[in-house]
Amino acid sequence: MAMIPSISKLLFVAICLFVYMGLSFGDFSIVGYSQNDLTSTERLIQLFESWMLKHNKIYKNIDEKIYRFEIFKDNLKYIDETNKKNNSYWLGLNVFADMSNDEFKEKYTGSIAGNYTTTELSYEEVLNDGDVNIPEYVDWRQKGAVTPVKNQGSCGSCWAFSAVVTIEGIIKIRTGNLNEYSEQELLDCDRRSYGCNGGYPWSALQLVAQYGIHYRNTYPYEGVQRYCRSREKGPYAAKTDGVRQVQPYNEGALLYSIANQPVSVVLEAAGKDFQLYRGGIFVGPCGNKVDHAVAAVGYGPNYILIKNSWGTGWGENGYIRIKRGTGNSYGVCGLYTSSFYPVKN
């Protein structure tokens, strides 16, 4: 892709106006690109405007819009170069396509508190894949145990979203009822975690086992930490009976747990490929410095299915498949580092 020089503000505004008037306000559910889009400023601006429309992007002034357009161009160049490598995954113009990687890391990762595991909880030892008899495929979405993908926004509350996915799953499995529960309640009330500055999924799960949790529509998500309002919301909607830890650094143990219910997991999500992930089986590049909590809701012969909390404008409609079976005890992106699930009798 040839580098296209920065353009003047006046020219940018003129082209934007021309492109905007010509846009079809149809379905932009997938904003893709072709090699022709990379050949001129006008085509790039048209692509940018289509992407803005899809993701409801509004900038405060023309200077910010030009700034975001320049980042968008750089990310598109990176996406195009990466996708030509024929990896098992591909990148795309997702909701984060106008953000630099440094900005993305600051806003959307780093929300797992330093002590992301605990010695308070025991685990059942599972030595390897051959020690357990589990299905080849598991997808808790197909079994009606997973609610729609949520969006945590710029609050570092991934730990609460991760915990809630597992609570919703086990309640469905035990009772037959799928309900949405309150991430905001965990954000407000878990005093061992740090609100929007990070937290512990295991601590959130212990809170629900000790007290309970309200429905999401009773205690809706606000994206900021406030005081704990559980008493104001009336009786709890659900309660679990405990928390278990999955044996760390053991793929077989994690698969065994996922086969029984959705599981809270952590991983390293700060890389540019993770930021711009569009689909396929992700293999990295990434390390083991876990900085984000998600939920494992299934697996296949060569991947683990992850539900994220960045909305449906990222990944495979809010999901990512992470490569498994690599022989790395940490797992790709540190996925086997720290995993927990709620107990419901």
Swiss-Prot record:
Changing residue 169 to S: Enhanced thermostability and higher optimum temperature. The keyword Hydrolase applies. Repressed by the active-site-directed cysteine protease inhibitor E64 (L-trans-epoxysuccinyl-leucylamide-(4-guanido)-butane) produced by Aspergillus japonicus. Inhibited by the inhibitor of cysteine proteases from Trypanosoma brucei (TbICP, rhodesain) and Colocasia esculenta cv. Kaohsiung no. 1 (CeCPI, tarocystatin). Repressed by leupeptin, a peptidic cysteine, serine and threonine protease inhibitor. One of its GO terms (biological process) is proteolysis. It catalyses: Hydrolysis of proteins with broad specificity for peptide bonds, but preference for an amino acid bearing a large hydrophobic side chain at the P2 position. Does not accept Val in P1'. Residues 1-18 form the signal peptide. Pfam families: Inhibitor_I29 (PF08246), Peptidase_C1 (PF00112). Optimum pH is 4. This is Papain. It comes from Carica papaya. The lineage of its organism: Eukaryota, Viridiplantae, Streptophyta, Embryophyta, Tracheophyta.
